[in-house]
């Protein structure tokens, strides 16, 4: 660069892409199972954990799930069984939602990919002081700036329980079975907005 000339444009090609997307994503998947029993009763249980990094930096998905089931022969003709299962998952949503209606779902995900991949190389993603520049808006601006200013996460929790019995009325011929179950689900959306300077 000639120090006697004014620099009008600078090449920032690829910077926005590198600030937005991961080159590699890490995934974990763990599973544990236990089971056993005797002539009186049986049981089985499992526990799982799954974690996956998103393609976009600062996004990921996590899930924990488990089950437990058991049966026990109270009398020679009566067996009871019970069990339960649960699932918990959490993932952050992108910051590209409508600022006036943050609960209405995603409205600008395609802008994030389109703008990031097609941004002209002379666009500077940095302010003069070295901080990330906001760009045009949260939907098509600088993801590196907006990812910490607008945060939203979705959490799901699902739980089920069951209990039942089997009564042998006539040996090997007639049985009376009864079962009942309960299912509970909880959905939570968290949204926060930090100070924005543009």
Could you tell me what each predicted segment is?
Residues 32-38, 66-72, 161-169:
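Residues on the lipid-exposed face of transmembrane beta-strands in outer-membrane beta-barrel proteins
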Residues 50-52:
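Ligand-site clamp/hinge motif
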Residues 9, 30-32:
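N-terminal periplasmic accessory domains that precede
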Residues 19-21:
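C-terminal beta-signal and adjacent terminal beta-strands/loops
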Residues 27, 38-39, 73-77, 170-172:
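Outer-membrane beta-barrel channels and translocator barrels
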